[in-house]
Amino acid sequence: MNKKSVKDIDVKGKVVFCRVDFNVPMKDGKVTDDTRIRAALPTIEYLTGQGAKVLLASHLGRPKGQVTEELRLTPVAKRLQELLGQEVKKADEAYGDNVKKQISDLKDGDVLVLENVRFYPGEEKNDPELSKAFADLADVYVNDAFGAAHRAHASTAGIAAYLPAVSGFLMQKELEVLGKAISNPDRPFTAIIGGAKVKDKIGVIESLLDKVDNLIIGGGLAYTFVKALGHEVGKSLLEEDKVDLAKSFMDRAKEKGVNFLIPTDVLVADDFSNDANTSIVPISEIPSDLEALDIGTETREKYADVIKNSKLVVWNGPMGVFEIDAFAKGTKAIAEALAEAKDTYSVIGGGDSAAAVEKFGLADQMSHISTGGGASLEFMEGKELPGVTALNDK
């Protein structure tokens, strides 16, 4: 991925339109998790340090193309000000004459947070008019929003047609780490694919079968594979229309010499709660009236063993319903195995896996936590990311 970065251009005295990913959780008008804001700090601090006038653009939530008061970026700007230790100004719109007036008052090194770009219907449609209106505000475009790189929107892709366009440090690191994992991995290379649905992970499983030494399956999608082996799955999540596909994946893994691991035992429950009665059974003995909601003890140990003997592990998707403690042990076992495997480079593919390592207090022991769930998945599938394609080549 040879794209220009902020270090390849001169930004002193220039107005920089920097697309960041400030789509953070909020409660009662306060930011409850500032991880994504912190992740953008190196780029913002570099730009201010170089004497740029920095405009920060982001989406927040899904306002559906109209102004939604509780989705304004004001609390985000406030939190950013605390983290940066300098005044952060806030605009009430994302473009237009009022914003231009605010920009003309900026000094070198100042920061102005623009309003939620998804307040405008043209953002998600990648409308050229809106892209141009954004571009008219600035001299340079920087994209540091890896989490939105798989979207062809006005502020992530369209704007790049009208300005010099480069990546920020976060975007650059994501592309380097994930790019190496896909094109030149250290071996043994293990991928762990969890989550609820096979249909969401078809592309990534297909792509990884050509690259990995071990492919570990967990989460709700595992039961379609269990069914493909000829076992009944009780009330567990099952995609009947994907059973043949699951079988073909296992056959293809065998042909390629890939070690394809699915659970050998599972935790079954009579209720979707912490008070449920649970027991651990082999996959051949899942009772018809119960639901499997996590991997079993034997499976946990087997998976941990594979992890410890790997040089590179990419993890995307939990092993069970980890939000409920009764069904979190499998996911926790994976996180702990990664934390303990000191010679293993661990890449956590955003989304639920990132939330899980946070929940278990193990985030700082992972080598790289991706800031983009959907984007990292599409990147690993080998798809082009519009937000990356739009940037200038070196």
UniProtKB/Swiss-Prot annotation:
GO biological process, one term: glycolytic process
Pfam family, one: PGK
Molecular-function annotations in GO: ADP binding; ATP binding; phosphoglycerate kinase activity
Chief subcellular location: cytoplasm
Modified residues (Phosphothreonine): T299
Oligomer and partners: Monomer.
Protein name: Phosphoglycerate kinase
Lineage: Bacteria, Bacillati, Bacillota, Bacilli, Bacillales
